Structure formats: C-alpha cells, structure tokens
C-alpha cells in the first residue's frame, strides 16, 4: 500500500539529440559528478553542474551500443560497421576491442560486465568475454533441439472447450493464422537485447520470418535455451526484470493493449493491461528499475509523450505516476540509475539537451487510520479503524478525470495532485462511508504550470508546501489557493511565498500541531533546516536543526509526550535508505524497514521483528516477532492496532501489548473502568493491571469503579484474576516506571488479594442486591466460604431461583465436596441439605449420616461434625463442653491429635483432669526427647520422680537438687552423681561448683579444676586458702604447658605438610596440562556436586546420571564422603580433600587463642617455678609463629579460581567455553560453598606484653 513520492526533480543541461547515457560510479561506491552522453555519434563528458565539455572523446559513425566498463575505467563503443573500440574517458585514447566484418546490429553487456552479446547484421548471435574472446556464435533463426521444443500432449482440444456465445459451431472452425502478420517487412526490424539481473541469461527480440516479432532466450555460454510461444502482435521493446521472473514485451490485442509477461521458458505468464491503445500511443521504451520495483513505460502520441510508472502488489499492477512531456521538446531516452542507493532515480533526456533527474521513494500516505493508494485515475481509500480491507480492494474508490501523481490527506481535507498539475480539493471528508461532495478543481497559475512539484505536503488549513529544484538549489514554495476573479467559479493555486535553500531538498516534515514551522533536509550534505512562517506569511530559514552523517530518505517530526529538548516539545525521526533509524541524530536501530509513531511510542520494524521505543527517554521497551519482511502500513491509536503489509501484499492487523497497555492506562486515567476492562478482556491483558496501574487512585475511587462496571461477571473476573504481585513491576513493566509507583500506607503487595477483596467487599455490602455474584467471588478469594454460603442462604428465603443461580456460580469457583464440608461446618442442616441437593451427591451417602448427627446432643453433635471436618481444636472445645462423662474420650482425643496446649486451655477449670493432661503432655515430650520441658510438665502433673529423672538426663543440676529436696533425697549423693557426667560434657566449672558446695574434700575440688585445665581458678582458690601453689598446681600446669607446646608444633608441621602437598599437586597438574581429572577417573561416581551449581561434565551425560549411584542412605553417603575426601596420597580428589582438611585445621587453630592466653597467664603466676616463664614465652612464640604461617598462606591456598569471582559469566558459559576451567569448576563444586572461601581469622588480644 505504498505510493511513489517524488523527492525532487533536478534540471540539468546536457547535449542535444542524445542517444545513450552512461553513468560513472566512483571507486568507493558513490556517484561521480561526471557522466557521459552519446549524441550525434559523439561522446561528451557532462558535469552535474550542467557545463558541457566540448571536447569530443570519440567520434564514430553509426554508434549502435555503448557501455561504461567499471573495472577497466573505459567506454566500450560498438558501431554499425562492426568496430568495437575502448575509449579512455580521461585522455580520450582509443584501443581496438574487436571487429565484425558483417556489421553489428546491437550490443549488450551482462550486468556483471563479464560477458558481452552481439547481434550482427546477418542475424548471428555472438557471445564474447570481457577480453573479447569468442564464447559462442550461432544464427538467430536456429531451432531448438527436439528435446527442448514445446510438446502438445493432446489436452484441451478445441472440440471439448466451452465457447460461450459463439456456440458449438466455433468448435468446427479451423484455427486461423490471420492474426500473424505475413509481411514481416512492415514491422520495425530493430533487434533488442536484454540481460537478466544475475547475468546468467539474456533475451533477443527480433522479427522472424513467418512469425513476426518474437524472442529467444540464451544462457551466458551462448546456448539457445528457449524460444517464445507463438504470440501475435508483439512489439519491438523487450526488457527482462532484474529479479529474473518475467520478460516484459508490449502486445496488441483487438480489444486491449498489454505488457505481456513471459517466463524464462518463453511461455506467457500474465499481463499488465495498459490504459491506452498501442496503435494510438505506441511504446517506445520499457525499463525496469534496478531493484525490479518499478516498471517505466515510455510512450509517444501525436500531441505528447508520456512516462508511466507501474508497481505490483498482491498480484495487482498499480499505476503510480504519469509524466507528461510536450511534443515541442520530445524525449530522447529514459535511463534508470544503476548506482547503489539511487535505484529509484530516473534520468530523462530530451532532444533539446535538457536532462531531468527524478528521484522517488516509496512511502505510505496515511492520515491517522485512513490510508490511500494511488492506482492510475483511481484513489483507493481505506479506514483501518473500521475494517481491514486487503488490497487491491478498498473501502471507497475516488475516480478522477486524469492520472493521479500525489495526494495529501489531513484532518477532513483531501488534496489530489494529477499529472496535468491540477489539484482537486475536498474539504469535508468525515467518514468514508458517506457520499462525498464533488471536489473543487484548482488550476495552476502561469508560474506553476511548468514546474515539477515535489514533496507536496499539507501545512495549514489554507496552505500547502512544495519544493522545486534547479541549478543546485531548491525553492520552498508556500502554495495558496483562491477564486479566479476573471473567471467566477474557477479556482487556481499559486505561490504565496517562497525561500531558496542551497542544495537539493529531498524531504519535508511538518509538525502535526505547530503549524508555523516545518523542517527540510538537503540531500547534498544531510543538513536539516528549521523553516518558519512569519506573521506576514513569508517563509524564513531559522537555523540548522540537526546534521546527519548521511542524508535520510524519510523524515518525520513527532511530538514527544512530557519532554522538552532544547526548548522544543518534539523530535525529528529520520530513516536512511541504508535502513538506519535516528531520533535527532541519535541512532535508534539499524536494518530498519519501516516506522510510525503511535501515542508516545516509536514503532519500527526490522526483517522479522517489531520494536517499540519510548519517545521521552528513547528507551526500547518491548519487541515482538513478526512475519519476515512485513512493514508497517498504519497504526490506529484508539484501538491499539498496527496494520502490517506482508511481502506478498496481504495485510495483517495486530494489537501489540505495549500499545494496548498504553490505551488501557489512558482509559484508567480518565476513569473509564468499563472500557478498560473490555479492552483488557479482548486483548487478554491480565486484569490485575486495573488495580496496579495506580493503586492510590483505585483506592480513592473504588466507588466510581463499581458504579462504572455494568457487568457483574466482569467484576467476578477481575476478582478471580487477582494475584499478590505488582504487574507494573513484573509482566507489564515495559509501560511503567517503578520509581513512580506509590502505595497507600496500609497496603502491602504480598497481601494485595486480601486488601482489594476487603476494599470491594465493604463497598459491595452496601448494595448486595446488585453485587451478589462479585460479593460471593470476593468471599471465595478471602477464603470465607461460610460467609458466601450465608449470602446464598439468605437469598434462599426470598428468591429460590436466584439462590440456585448463586449456588451454581459458587460451585463453579469451589469444589463441591469442599463446599459441602463448609456447609456442614455451619451446623445448619437446612443449608447442608440445600448444598447437597444442588451438588449431585447421592442421598444415600449423606442422609443417614445427617440423621445420625441429629440424634446427638448439640455439643457432642458439633464435636462429631468438627472431627469429621478435621477441625480438631474446635472439636475439642465442643467435647470439653460435654462434661465429665467424656473425660477419657477427651484425653484419648488429645493424645491422638497432639492437642495438649488446647486441652489445658479448655479444661482450665477441671483441676484434676488437667493434671492428667499434664502427665500425658510430659510423656509426649519425653518421647520426642524434649526432656527439659517434660520435667516441667511432670512436676505440674504431680509426678516428681519422673520430673527428677528427666532433669538428670538433661544435666540441669540446679533443678535436680530442687526436686531431690522435694523428694527428701540426700543432696550430697545426688550432687556427687552429677559431677562425672558434667565433666564428660566439658562443663568443668559447673562440676567444680557442685563439688565445692556439697563436698568438703579440698583435694577433690582441686582435682576437678586441674582435670578441666582451669589453672587460673585453681591458683585463685589456692591463694584464698594460703595453699602452696607450687606444690599442688605447678606440676600439672607445667606438664600441660609442655603438652600444649608440642601440640602447637605439631599443628604447624601438619599445616605446612598439607599446604606443600596441595601446591605440589597443583604444580604437577599445571605441567601435565590435563586439568584436574585424570583420564581414568570416572565422573559417574561423583554424586556430591553442590546444589549451588548447574554444571555437568561432558562425560556426565543423562544416561550416566540415571545409572549412577544415588546414595539415598545417609550412612552410605557419609561413607562415600569419607572415601572421596580421603587424604591418602594418590586419591584422584586429593587436592579437594586437602583443601577441606586445611579449612578445618585453620578453623581449629584460630579457636585456640583464648586457651593459649589463659595458659600463659597461669604460668606467669607461678613466680617460684623456674621453668614457668620460659615455657610461657615459648608457648606464645610458637602460637604466634603458627598464626603468621597460616595468615601468609591463606591466599596461596584459596586461589581466585577456587573462589569463583564471576568466572561463570566469563569463560564457563557462552560460545567460547574454557573446558579446562569448566572441569576445575566441577571439581571445586564438590566442596561446600563455605570451604571454597578462606577462613576468616577473628583475632583477639591474646598476647601478653611481658612475654614479647
């Protein structure tokens, strides 16, 4: 649905009577400002400025073909006499290429300029290489081999065909060849050659004896491949579409004129019906654009010459442009530009020497949701807001008297610009379905009647903009229209104001709402200028807005919501032909094929994806896949719809989530909750967004929300979809800024469902008759099924049919068995029967049970019901109300369900029975090894002996002594029985306290202190009693000091040994280069990988995981761990075992700071012992040496690769995987995450200054 928009028409001065045009590309791929024109058998070099270099490069008679050879930087010229020469365009020097003694009729080079085809005057086809070596030569009238000729298999005989109005007699008539011209001398005898775009085949059109005009297809080796099927009245022009699917040839029929399209095999495929008669307006030239998008047809009539430009879409040919030229200055030739980036540039040379350069670009003419397509004299309009009408159909067709070249649609106005430079204006297009008024015809004034207007654009209700280029500059024209004073009833348009800009303007953009300024871009340097309309209606160039590195083919000024850049609330969007998209010069994307602006989003497409960019911060917020090659036609903001056209021409309408959310948000901002929910339901948007969009607004306007929703079912749907999640920060975060979201003070996201349901429930309870269904749904979401049933049961008393409907709704939300149980839990048998009857339950299942319950006392009935519903606490409360006769049942029920605390609360007034509960509770606690609590419960239950035993097991010696006293047991004996167990658990100080209080034996007291190495306390006690410290304590303390010193030395040696073994293993592995795992180690046995890693060895496949060991038993797993972390030399995982052992050893060393300090202090207190001070100094020195050795080696043992440090993202994943590092990571995963990091040595002040 694209139209051809004229970007500029540049007028140059060339050479009169031109015959050929040669364009010279630069070596870097750009366009040179020098081109060559062949005129009057001379070659001229012409500059873009229009100055003609009068030096004749070559002068040959009867030039029949010419080509600029890029690789040789030479011009190849063929003459009718048979000469083929090469001309140097710089010096004019010539060299002979080849010579044909019989003369040359036509010459054509292949597109890649590797092969050249000639047709001689004797109708021989000669194929040569670029160095003029003959590849093949054969007569033009040679026949195909028998195996390549067309075969008639007898299908479709004339006798069996339907002949319509001619009747059956037509079947008996013999086929006449009268349609073929017998005298081929009457035909144009020119021979035409055309190559396919890939250079593999070429076609030769000529006049054959007995057949008339026909053509043949040859390959690049000169072999005849196909001949055309018999076709009458073919014309002499022939051109092969560069993409290669069609060969175009004009063809005349009695009732129509066409461009016949043949396939490579010579069979007629389809046709393009021309809007004129070839007899009156014959085709002079056929030319395809280099990209095969546009077919140019040049015709010549008596009064004028025309150029028709056709495009194809969805198998329909659209006539997009018609150029009209007077016979007073006829056309000489057409030539499509073949240079890169200029595929839609057409060069038109006139006999007078004028050179017109037309530059078109494809663009979609859209006015909001209305899109128009030009097709000859018809304008096809479709409003995509109302319907998706696939092309070539449309909702409405406007017909005009002449061909349409451009049209403008803005608001309710429509301007149509025709090929005869008239403008038709219709100012009242409201809807396309209504009858349109007859448009006003605006005639051009004398100045505009001879100008080629480009970039025709709407500017204001009474003005249009256009451009006209000449002599290297461009005039910006402000067009106005008025009534003709001389001829009442006639209107004309004229130039109201103009301003000239240096360079060629190829794009114009007008701000949608600021109608006093617009922007233009020049193709020469990529400058974009801001032009304003002054109060006196004159145009003025204000400034250079932005400088692009390369000029764009499409620019668009867009309004940016809530953003001001440099004082302007807008931005310039530009799209280059190389598919680069920019906003104010900032690159947004590349490989962009189309774009449009919808609300606050820039939507653009790439080959198979669509992206959405927020205009205010230029942030890409979303993307989605589309069909390959699809392009944007238009977007309908009010329906969040984007219309795409696929490569084959059909349309696809989608509603992207980003646009739908934008529309829903706008509706919510305006309080249109009904429409917001309707749009969300239609587009499958989660209804949580209704609340999450603006929580504070929703809470404050909950009444308006309920009043605006007409459908109770929609409220039910809203409530049922609620989740404890903020969708503006999760699923729909693309449309929201998390920093701007605010909540009420009493709101929490993790309690969102309860919060919203409570909020709505309070409002809906005021109008229960209107919100019955949503109220029931809210109770279900809150888990208050009983309240939902009460609402239904209340309606049952007034309207049974309505209650049935409400119950059916509830049964849709809740399982029938759960609902039956809830009804049973209300103890209302009427409600139970009502639910049971509607739930399709078998009466044989519930009626006997209900009858049995009715026969029971009320409290015991409630107990049975609660027990059935597994509401054990409530059941026990009802059982407690039944009295003393149910004590035994209650005690058994408490034991069965573990309701000890509840039972104690319910039977608080039953003192004696409560003691039974205490004892039962104590038995339970003792069974689960909670002996301290069991002792307390036994005491409350009056069983002091059991309380004493339980306290003894926990070594709660203070409580044991208290209970022993209550039981009148000897305290000294009880205390002596506790000393040994306390010492076994390392509680030496508590054992000493018992001995000191209940045993008067001083030796026994000191023995307890010395066995616990509590030397400082022993010295303290000895000092208080004036005992001899050196006699009682010194020997033991000195012996312990010597032992501790030996232990520290052993710890140091063990640490150094482990460290050295680890370093040796790492050094050997680094030298071998085989990683950490030997080739004979089977990783299938390694099942201790950490849960924190997801890595697996390449050997550790899915099969090996299924067949490997599982170690379900904890005993087996511990056994396997011991085997895996064995420190035995030669273990495949010895390095892992050493790291594990070192971590444990360092942790143990760090914990010895306090014992070493205390021991040294005690030794210092032995002033009379000669060996005490040296031993204390040695202890401190040994321990300091040990700590220094450990601290210095930590970083050497726990290396960065062992710690990880983000290596996963660097080389363990992605396309470039370091498999050696991956293998190491798998081994390190065997360690617990804690042991992969070095131990933290928390140092205390353990040293004594006097021992330094």
UniProtKB/Swiss-Prot annotation:
Residues 814-1252 are annotated as: Mediates dimerization. Signal peptide: none annotated. Residues 1097-1116 are annotated as: Disordered. It is found in: Cytoplasm; Nucleus; Cytoplasm, Cytoskeleton, Spindle. Residues 1106-1116 have a biased composition (Basic residues). InterPro entries: A-sol_ELP1, Elp1, ELP1_b-prop_2, ELP1_N_b-prop_1, HB_ELP1, TPR_ELP1, WD40/YVTN_repeat-like_dom_sf. Disruption phenotype: RNAi-mediated knockdown is lethal in larval third instar (L3) stage. RNAi-mediated knockdown in sensory organ precursor cells abolishes central spindle asymmetry during asymmetric cell division. RNAi-mediated knockdown in adult mushroom body neurons impairs protein synthesis-dependent long-term memory formation. Keywords: Cytoplasm, Cytoskeleton, Microtubule, Nucleus, Phosphoprotein, tRNA processing. Its main location: cytoplasm. The modification Phosphoserine is found at residue 1094. Residues 1111-1129 are annotated as: Required for binding to tRNA. Pathway: tRNA modification; 5-methoxycarbonylmethyl-2-thiouridine-tRNA biosynthesis. One of its GO terms (molecular function) is tRNA binding. GO terms for biological process: dosage compensation by hyperactivation of X chromosome; establishment of mitotic spindle asymmetry; long-term memory; tRNA wobble base 5-methoxycarbonylmethyl-2-thiouridinylation. Gene3D superfamilies: YVTN repeat-like/Quinoprotein amine dehydrogenase. GO terms for cellular component: cytoplasm; cytosol; elongator holoenzyme complex; microtubule; nucleus; spindle. Homodimer. Component of the elongator complex composed of Elp1, Elp2, Elp3, Elp4, Elp5 and Elp6. The elongator complex associates with and stabilizes microtubules; efficient interaction requires the full complex. Belongs to the ELP1/IKA1 family. Component of the elongator complex, which is required for multiple tRNA modifications, including mcm5U (5-methoxycarbonylmethyl uridine), mcm5s2U (5-methoxycarbonylmethyl-2-thiouridine), and ncm5U (5-carbamoylmethyl uridine). The elongator complex catalyzes formation of carboxymethyluridine in the wobble base at position 34 in tRNAs. ELP1 binds to tRNA, mediating interaction of the elongator complex with tRNA. Binding by the elongator complex stabilizes microtubules and promotes their growth. This is Elongator complex protein 1. The lineage of its organism: Eukaryota, Metazoa, Ecdysozoa, Arthropoda, Hexapoda.
